[in-house]
Amino acid sequence: IVEPSIINYIVSIIAKTRNWHTIEVGASPRAGVNILLAARAMAACHGRDFVVPDDVKTLTPWVLRHRIRLRPDAEIEGLLVDDVIRETLDSVEAPRR
């Protein structure tokens, strides 16, 4: 079971990557679908039939790492994709249970 608030959370994360100041090419809607599928799998592995925000937070870097491209100036500054993904995640408020 996936609550609408979790789906909205994933959509917000994807939207942030498309408007983030250090990201040149953000994640596509398909990346959001893959985050959702991965989060459902993680929930099942933990014996749950529901997804929690921490599932999304844990798996988002794994799903997005190869799907976004940093701006050249961000790369020159030494920023890493994982750092930018973490900043993006931190900027989106997770739903409360």
Model-flagged regions — what are they?
Residues 1-14:
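Histone-fold modules and their flanking histone-like tails across chromatin and transcription assemblies
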Residues 8, 17-97:
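C-terminal engagement/docking regions of AAA+ P-loop ATPases
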